[in-house]
Amino acid sequence: SHDWSSGGGFDTSLEVLPDSRVTPKGGERNLTAGEVAMARSVFGDGLDYDAVKVHRGGYWLFFGFQDEDTAVTPNGEMYFPGKHFKEDYSLESVGDQGWFIHEMTHVWQYQLGYWVKSIRGPRPNMSYAYTLDAGKQFCDFNMEAQGNICEDYYLAVIRGAQRLMRASKYRSNPMAPELLKTTLRDFLQNQSDSSNLPKVTE
């Protein structure tokens, strides 16, 4: 489960009133303006944001397979279990925003041609862990580690919430923000470059 500190509200230059709509169970919605601004802080122009849907209900909802605390993004769209679905993640806690960025990483992977579903599906024990090494590039990490790296970059560098990083070993490391920037260097220079996609599956 996700137990995060409070303190959300991604600051954008747009003055947008909160959307009063409520997405029904099993329904979907587009990204909000705040969510797009939040995602752009990591993925820049490397995504077609208009194509992204956020579902209230898991991808495996009707099969009973999905854990109630797990979101999945197998096809370029995000599926959050009901209790974790939000109408606008940019207005939620910084921790929830980080989770959103993790799932957006899988959207980015999918849109650039990575076979998210077929690669992740048969590997239920794929590691989310990562170690920041000057000799490793973003493409040297598997798809879930990439998700955590983007999430931690957002938390530590964009939001200044290093204490919430997924990789607990870096939460008090003063070098963590710079290490993240170094690992993401090629990605941040061109988020549309498919050479940044995972080259490993372990």
Where are these regions (language model features)?
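Structural recognition of the beta-strand scaffold that forms the well-ordered cores
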Residues: 79, 109, 149-151
